[in-house]
Amino acid sequence: VDNKGTMTVTDPESIGIQVDGDQAVVNNEGESAITNGGTGTQINGDDATANNNGKTTVDGKDSTGTEIAGNNGKVIQDGDLDVSGGGHGIDITGDSATVDNKGTMTVTDPESIGIQIDGDQAIVNNEGESTITNGGTGTQINGNDATANNSGKTTVDGKDSTGTKIAGNFGFVNLYRSLTLPGGAHGVANSGD
């Protein structure tokens, strides 16, 4: 699926693009605005790839920019990602998932998560600049054998704000650039063996 236009999705159960099946590829070139419980792109199947080159804005509880349910899912986020109000920018459920985040990521408000992966052997590469504020979470991985590589500048500010959180055994976070933590925030939270 090649989406080159602007996508606006609002309200629960509304989905901009839905693909059911293995080895799906979705290319989002234009801007996406997802609000009030909607989902921009949803892929159900193994070996899926989503390429997001345009800016993605996600606002509101249960709103999700890109969602993949299946093993070996991959999201390449070249465009900016702005998440607020309890939304999720990227949400993958399945083992061996990979996210390459090359754009600027801004996450604000409690329960807001820029990137969430539920599954083992996940890899997240944050290469762009990240700003996490007001109780938001930049990257959250729930599963064993996870790796987060943070090579971009990260600023985390505000109570309960977290840059990278891993819940599972044998998780690794590699920091290659500056991490700024004013205001009672957490840069890295790793729970597990």
Question: Can you say where each PLM-predicted feature lies in the sequence?
Answer:
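Beta-strand-rich solenoid/repeat architectures in extracellular/passenger domains
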Residues: V1-E13, V25-G37, T49-D62, K74-G86, ...
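Glycine-rich beta-solenoid repeat tracts in large extracellular/virion proteins
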Residues: I15-D22, T39-D46, K61-G70, H88-D95, ...
